């Protein structure tokens, strides 16, 4: 699961020790903007907060990504019951959290796994998805430097691209945004990336 890097306030908190309700109440009082990243034995999850309020949740299983209020409820129940999980609390600027929460707006399931740009050209694959009015995301892995990225699509159009360092909103389609998208895709193709395609549920 890919999230933006930020200011890690707490790391490796144990769900066996931390009361998630008390933690969220404290963060609400602080008008905290950022996310809580949970790691469990079979999944990774995140709660997205803006000014102390939980606005979205993400449950990442091997072949699906679930978001929204049901994901939030699932995460809260799991963190109360599963004593083997860990939590990281990361602070981000409010605008970054607004972008991040919006980017993870669709629940998706895996459609194609372990594709390689060496054998399946990424640009041509994206053109095919555009023709099909595809909604979902492409998770990209750069094997050379072990970095990750995500290309978000709605109705065939690329709406955002995210790496660990930045999230670029492409909805306005300005010249600089389109140039960034083209540069990212070209770099991914040259780097021989591996990628998975997830389609909207």
Please describe what each predicted stretch is.
Residues 1-201:
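Acidic, Ser/Thr/Pro-enriched low-complexity segments and adjacent helix/loop capping patches
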């Amino acid at each position: 699961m890919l999230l933006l890097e930020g200011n890690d306030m707490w790391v490796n908190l144990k769900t066996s020790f931390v009361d998630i309700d008390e933690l969220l109440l404290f963060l609400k009082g602080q008008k905290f903007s950022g996310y809580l990243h949970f790691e469990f034995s079979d999944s990774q999850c995140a709660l997205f907060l803006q000014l102390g309020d939980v606005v979205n949740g993400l449950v990442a299983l091997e072949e699906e990504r679930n978001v929204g209020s049901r994901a939030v409820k699932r995460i809260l129940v799991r963190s109360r019951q599963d004593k083997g999980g860990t939590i990281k609390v990361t602070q981000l600027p409010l605008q970054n959290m607004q972008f991040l929460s919006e980017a993870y707006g669709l629940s998706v399931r895996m459609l194609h796994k372990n594709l390689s740009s060496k054998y399946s050209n990424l640009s041509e694959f994206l053109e095919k998805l555009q023709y099909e009015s595809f909604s979902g995301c492409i998770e990209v892995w750069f094997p050379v430097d072990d970095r990750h990225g995500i290309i978000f699509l709605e109705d065939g159009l690329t709406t955002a691209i995210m790496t660990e360092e930045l999230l670029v909103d492409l909805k306005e389609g300005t010249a600089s945004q389109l140039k960034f998208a083209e540069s990212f895709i070209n770099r991914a193709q040259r780097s021989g990336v591996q990628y998975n395609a997830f389609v909207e549920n």
